[in-house]
Amino acid sequence: MVVNFGTTGSHCFATGTIVACHQFIQRDMDVTGMGFELGVTPFEDMPPLLEFPAVFAGLPNVRCGSGDGFVTSKLTVQCDVIDMEAYALAKVCRLENARFACAKYVTDGADHSAANDWHSNLPRAAAAFLDLYQSLIARRKTDKT
């Protein structure tokens, strides 16, 4: 299983929230001018929305929109959180038939102050992921006994 812990911006969730991403879309893939649907990579068989089973109990399950830059305005695709890497990881896992789990810490509101908020919230994200990781390990040990 490939596990991605990372940071995200969101218009839907408050800073400090950890979410479990189980759907992934490319938020900046737009070749609609060539007749393709928003989010579709031309001449690929991969669907624009990738979905994986939810694996993090107790966390909100969300759709993640990945792209190449910080979001500071309204999005053209529907997603709950925004990052720069999860879709690519999900795509590789789909191509390789690997399981994929993704948890994100909301560092910013995906707005004009996203870059500054992201930077100042990184230490909180690291601490939150350490706690999440330790709880997953403890739960796994309990499940084995």
Describe the residue ranges of each PLM region.
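Glycine-rich phosphate- or other oxyanion-binding loops that anchor nucleotides, phosphorylated ligands
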Residues: 1-144
